[in-house]
Amino acid sequence: MRDDLGITTKLENGKAYLEFALPEKIGRLLSALQIEIWEGAEGERLVFHGEYSSEETDSMTALLLRPHLWDGMRDPYVYLVKAQGRFGTVEYGENMGGIKNQEESDHAEDITEAVEVYWQQELAIYDVHVIDKKGIFLNEKEFLPHEVVYRLPPQISGAGTREEQIKGDLDRLARMGVNAIRLEGTGSGTEGQNRCEVRAFYSLCRRRGFLTDDLWIRPEILPVYRGLPGETMAEALLAADGRTLTERYYYYQAKWSSEPVLYPALPTLHRQENGLLSLSIYSNQKKVVLYVDGVLFLFQSAASGDPEFIFEDIPVAKLPLHLAAEAGNLSISLTVTKL
């Protein structure tokens, strides 16, 4: 079963105009190509059926009225596309995704056999574009990208199958507030990646509401999900062991997530030159309160767009030191035994 039927979409006046394209080196179409579009990822109801002859393969189009739009995290809706046709090939390989059917053919002298080829893939219909000096818009609504660079996990590890790892990664990124993902690389981020793996990854992203387009100018440095052994990267969100989330993960979670966040960044706890302590706390709440040994020490109000609250000159008479932080309905307590 193949998943590489080319599909481009254009939205106009509440209608979706679709154009289909066969992959390269597929062979010559010997029969009508049948294409169906079904509602929902599991194919609940047929909404389009088309048949295209070999003379029409350069202009295979479809029209959907009032399509259900894929709308990111709000509504990651996808259609199911099915297609099949018989193609003449010189040789048969597993990459044809079909069933070998030996038969004599008079379509062309160079066709030695015919293969029935099947496609099944998802279709997300949406519109994303950039308006100069205004921003990015998804389905005519402003879209603020919370984007990370993603590195595919190793094929073999102690953290389960690759698909299981990716699903777990996407769940963590969703909790962090990410809404756009780019595979590591330049441009579309897919250089050097296996095309089947890339399509499978993008399918998982679509189902979870992550945008994977490449239409806007990005900042020079994006946070990277999954560090590498021996690599020193300040923006890595996941350590090289594949299990440990870094401080930067919680920083961006406090910056991007819509869920309440309160996280004391213990690696930032250090003694100042004057002998007192300094500690950073990440939160998306309006105010953070710090207690030292049960006594109110200081509260800080949030600076615009900055999730980091830096508490300085924290007194330490002796160890262990008991700290507690509150923000909104959240609270957390710490016991410091050494510095």
Where are these regions (language model features)?
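Electropositive phosphate-/nucleotide-binding environments in soluble metabolic enzymes
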Residues: 242-246, 318-320
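Secreted/periplasmic carbohydrate-active enzymes, especially glycoside hydrolases
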Residues: 1-184, 188-190, 195-210, 262-339
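Aromatic/acidic polysaccharide-binding cleft in carbohydrate-active enzymes
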Residues: 213-243
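Short hydrophobic/aromatic-rich motifs at helix boundaries and adjacent loops
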Residues: 141-142, 220-225, 260
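Flexible, active-site-adjacent loop/turn segments at secondary-structure boundaries
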Residues: 126, 235-237, 247, 253
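Proline/serine/threonine-rich low-complexity linkers at boundaries of modular beta-sandwich domains
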Residues: 1, 252-261
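Metal-dependent phosphoesterase/phosphodiesterase active-site architecture
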Residues: 243-244, 250, 305-309
